[in-house]
Design a protein with these regions (language model features):
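Active-site-adjacent structural elements that line small-molecule/cofactor binding pockets in enzymes
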Residues: 1-156
């Protein structure tokens, strides 16, 4: 098994793609990475960073969210079939926000481009619940790291 260097390379970035159009929260040299699972994503993002160290890797995630996991699974069962080449998340907005924050905190990717699989309410939930939850999680993680560093410097 290969070793991969994983570490966040900057602030978390999030975008939403609808068809051939994408909205991203920050400009920059961003490259979208597609993989069916986290292992493949880790490999592809590591290879990208080795080839092009100044770009930011954003993982594409097919998304089906609802207010509860049962409703999200039911909506996914009724959705058209997918090609299976993109990471898939089916669940709640908070769960999706946690996945995005974890992918960034572990240094697997610099963020995500969310691809809504259902239009009925999915885009609204991404805008109204996922994005604010991601901002809160990243803010809490940053504050915790700063608090820990401050405490360590006082004891040194």
């Amino acid at each position: 098994m290969a070793d991969f260097h994983i570490a966040p390379t900057g602030p978390l970035r999030v975008g939403v793609a609808l068809g051939d159009r994408a909205w991203l929260d920050t400009p920059g040299d961003l490259v979208r990475v597609r993989a069916a699972d986290l292992r493949g994503l880790t490999r592809k993002a590591a290879a990208l960073r080795e080839e092009r160290p100044h770009v930011h890797a954003l993982v594409d995630i097919d998304v089906m969210v609802a207010r509860d996991a049962h409703s999200a699974r039911a909506a996914m069962a009724a959705a058209p079939p997918r090609d299976g080449t993109t990471l898939l998340y089916v669940g709640t907005p908070v769960g999706l926000a946690g996945l995005i924050a974890d992918i960034h905190a572990l240094g697997i990717a610099d963020g995500a481009v969310l691809i809504p699989l259902g239009r009925d309410g999915v885009i609204d939930l991404i805008r109204d619940e996922v994005l604010p939850a991601v901002r809160t999680m990243v803010s809490l993680h940053t504050e915790t790291r700063l608090h820990t560093k401050t405490r360590e410097s006082r004891t040194a």
